[in-house]
Regions:
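Charged interaction scaffolds used for protein-protein
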Residues: 1-12, 23, 27-42, 62-104
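Short linear motifs in exposed loops
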Residues: 16-17
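N-terminal glycine-rich flavin-associated loop
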Residues: 20
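Short, hydrophobic/amphipathic alpha-helical patches that form generic packing surfaces
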Residues: 46-57, 92
Length: 104
């Protein structure tokens, strides 16, 4: 698997975060620094938001809303993956964007 890449129903999606995205997430109430210190536990609303922000950098023409991201997330979970694998892909992409070494 390529880092940050997931396949859903034969279509590839790349999850990537940059500093502008991380700041936008904070403004939206999703503090990734609290996540990195263990102060924040993700619920499904936050997971969908994290997924949306990761997709919107590269797939902005296809993923225009959190609901769009939720549909892709549901398709992934129904057809090809599980929530733990998807969460690991998102967290590892986020860790790389912050300049830390990847962890599991």
């Amino acid at each position: 698997m390529v880092d940050g890449l997931i396949t859903v129903n034969g279509k590839q999606y790349f999850i990537k975060y940059d500093m502008n995205t991380i700041c936008e997430m904070k403004l939206d109430g999703l503090d990734v620094m609290a996540l990195s210190t263990g102060e924040l536990e993700l619920d499904f609303i936050q997971l969908r938001s994290l997924f949306y922000y990761g997709l919107k950098k590269i797939q902005r023409d296809q993923i225009k809303s959190k609901e769009d991201a939720g549909y892709v997330m549901s398709d992934y979970l129904e057809s090809e993956g599980n929530i733990e694998d998807l969460t690991n892909v998102m967290v590892n992409a986020l860790v790389r964007s912050l300049g830390f070494k990847e962890g599991k």
